[in-house]
């Protein structure tokens, strides 16, 4: 049973020199993006602000991603949810399984991108990387027919000081609306996201502890003083050792688990390992039998050949896609069913 926790948000910052919330400037003048993310060129993100450094993640050479952008992105529908509670609207990208049968029950994956997608066109939440598209590929759908939803937020919905916006609650009601509209199994709802998206997924697990069957947190962190609720959850938490903030957050959460005597598994892998090696590593990790799984990419392994740094944010932005490329983790996610 999940624990009832007290939502206390004011904690000591994990990295000194962090700018205060009131001083931060987001992509649309709202909350500053986690780790200083700003919008950048096509298929890339540009660092800026607190953790940024002007570095850009150029994904034009990722042939698999470019193929997904061409072949998979057009299969999503751009729709608008009208929220009766707030009177506001929220756009979202929705993938409906091919040959959808209302007599069958389908899982749903929610992907939330990083803050560089805020203020961009609605297609960017898909084309920015692997996180939204991979679930809707023919290969994935052949194994795991599923709905995929990607909210198009118009403001930065969480920040480094653990503030959050009302749009998160609207996104929750969107999921609830989809489960009423389609034949979606409410025991197989999954959330994942990178940076701001991972932070949002942390927040959702704390605020709605019975909503998701499992989570995949990528390159992100949250207030560890309230994350002991995750000790009863099923998740993978993947960061790069070269991510100066998310790696600290991950280590801090493992300390919480240690302090409470909660079981978990942890492994360090090279992001450059081939698929067979990575999937074998996933199997070895899961063989330990724990529902909480932490993975740290070894320092420098998310950088492109010849790249010595990811900018001021280190290997933050460069680590996201590597996490979503791990087939064994994706397969594990769909095996999770809410008790």
Q: Which role fits each region the language model picked out?
A:
Residues 23-108, 199, 265-272, 339:
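A domain-start/cap signature at the N-terminus of enzymes
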Residues 99-100, 104, 158-195:
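Gly/Ser-rich "nucleophile elbow"/oxyanion-hole loop immediately N-terminal to the catalytic nucleophile
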Residues 180-181, 187-231:
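Primarily recognizes the serine-hydrolase "nucleophile elbow" in alpha/beta-hydrolase
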Residues 108, 112-172:
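Active-site machinery of serine-nucleophile hydrolases
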Residues 232-241, 254:
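Catalytic His-Asp charge-relay segment
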Residues 3-22:
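Sec-dependent N-terminal signal peptides of Gram-positive bacterial secreted proteins and lipoproteins
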Residues 112-119, 179-182, 194, 201-206, ...:
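Cell-envelope and extracellular/periplasmic
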Residues 52-53, 238, 242-245, 263-339:
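C-terminal catalytic histidine-bearing segment of alpha/beta-hydrolase fold enzymes
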């Amino acid at each position: 049973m999940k624990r009832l926790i007290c939502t206390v948000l004011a904690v000591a910052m994990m990295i000194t020199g962090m700018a205060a919330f009131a001083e931060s400037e987001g992509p649309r003048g709202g909350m500053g993006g986690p780790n200083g993310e700003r919008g950048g060129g096509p298929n890339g993100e540009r660092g800026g602000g607190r953790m940024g450094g002007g570095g850009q993640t150029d994904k034009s050479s990722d042939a698999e991603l470019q193929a997904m952008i061409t072949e998979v992105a057009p299969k999503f529908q751009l729709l608008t949810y009208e929220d009766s509670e707030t009177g506001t609207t929220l756009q979202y990208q929705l993938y409906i399984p091919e040959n959808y049968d209302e007599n069958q029950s389908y899982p749903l994956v929610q992907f939330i991108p990083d803050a560089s997608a805020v203020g961009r066109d609605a297609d960017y939440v898909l084309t920015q990387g692997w996180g939204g598209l991979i679930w809707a590929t023919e290969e994935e759908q052949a194994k795991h027919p599923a709905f995929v939803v990607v909210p198009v937020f118009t403001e930065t919905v969480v920040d480094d000081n653990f503030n959050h916006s009302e749009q998160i609650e609207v996104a929750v009601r969107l999921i609830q609306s989809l489960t009423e509209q389609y034949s979606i199994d409410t025991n197989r709802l999954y959330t994942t996201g990178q940076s701001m998206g991972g932070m949002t997924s942390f927040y959702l697990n704390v605020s709605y502890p019975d909503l998701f069957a499992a989570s995949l947190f990528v390159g992100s962190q949250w207030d560890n003083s309230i994350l002991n609720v995750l000790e009863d959850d099923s998740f993978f938490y993947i960061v790069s050792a070269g991510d100066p903030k998310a790696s600290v957050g991950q280590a801090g959460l493992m300390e919480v688990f240690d302090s409470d005597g909660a079981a978990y598994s942890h492994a360090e892998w090279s992001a450059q390992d081939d698929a067979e090696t990575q999937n074998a590593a996933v199997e070895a990790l899961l063989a330990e039998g724990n529902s909480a799984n932490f993975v740290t990419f070894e320092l420098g392994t998310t950088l492109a050949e010849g790249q010595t740094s990811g900018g001021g944010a280190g290997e933050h932005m460069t680590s996201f896609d590597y996490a979503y490329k791990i087939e064994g983790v994706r397969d594990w996610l769909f095996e999770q069913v809410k008790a």
